[in-house]
Amino acid sequence: MLLEKLIRISKKVKDFKVNIAYSRCEKHVLTFACQEMGWQLTTKKGDGDIIWFIDGVKSDQIDMVRNLTYGHFNRYPKSYILCNKREFHILLNKYSNFFPDAFKFVPNTFVLPDDYVEFKDHFETHKDAILIAKPSKGRCGQGIFFWKEHQDLDQEKMKECLYIAQDYIPNPLLIDNKKFDFRLYFMICGVDKMEAYIAFEGMSRFCTEDYIPPKASNDNIDDEEREMMKMNGYSEDNLMSHLTNYSLNKTSLKFVNNNDFQQKDDGSKRLLSTVMKLMEERGVDIDKFKSDVKDICTKLAYAYRPHLVNNYHKVIGPSDEVNQNWFHIFGLDVMVDDDHKVWLLEINCFPSFDCRLDEIEIDPETKKKVKVK
């Protein structure tokens, strides 16, 4: 396995090196991880046992990668395509056609405007349907809104900004009457022989408003918060009751920055391990929760594999010497409903490990743990 291989190499090689020349803002957390592992850092071009890219392998770096048969690389070629919500759900929908029961951890999803007819039929047959719409290339919760009843799509707007629309999960598991989700990290290794790993330490992100079903009134946002939401492109719905995004909830006067997160469990961001204990107290089978998350990661790895293998051989070539030396860390956003079912909300192909601008202590602490583990 790649991790065991890296550990064996690092023990045999006196100066096991990680090249941070291409890592930009992530070099700080890499420096910490190398200190913990006893590894060396280098910025020399073409040098290192691990070459860390922030974005991916660029065209002028391909020859270097091909020639470094001993190097290990953290970005699969053209993996950025999978970051697009639209492309991701088109991929999963194709698999669901062949394996209808395999991907039931994903809410029913419409890719718009392509699925307009199915989208319209859904509202006609499900009168109480509530869908949550997300821009295909959106981030930080921007541009998200709810569809509570059928309304014709603005076809021109859809062409400018493609959307996905998903069945809203109306029964989230609540802690302190707040909705929450998890950001976990999993890693795919190798090309022709693929392996997957998951780190069961991550972050749990809480809404700052008590949960209110989407049909309820949203009058509990004060004028200052509503104006801030408008400035950042958020809809009029009280998204602070529904979206856990830090970029949204940090603007709330109710945001709790708990720097003593190792001892207390009342912050708007908490450790995954802390929240799992609270879930267990509420009757959630944590072993099953972990098993369900592993099942999601396994199926995502299988779904991604043809794309990753195909683009690897197109860009790098059929080199058996180096194709097992590639790995990629993904950010996985999941939530649990009050029936204890685990749902996949989103996957991030380029989760940030930048610790420079983190405003609360739990962020760099969690990112460092993920890098080391």
Feature locations, PLM:
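Conserved N-proximal alpha/beta basic substrate-recognition cap immediately N-terminal to
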Residues: 3-130, 137-139, 149, 175
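Short, flexible/disordered secondary-structure transition segments
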Residues: 41-45, 70, 99-103, 304-315, ...
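A short acidic/small-residue loop/turn micro-motif
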Residues: 350-352
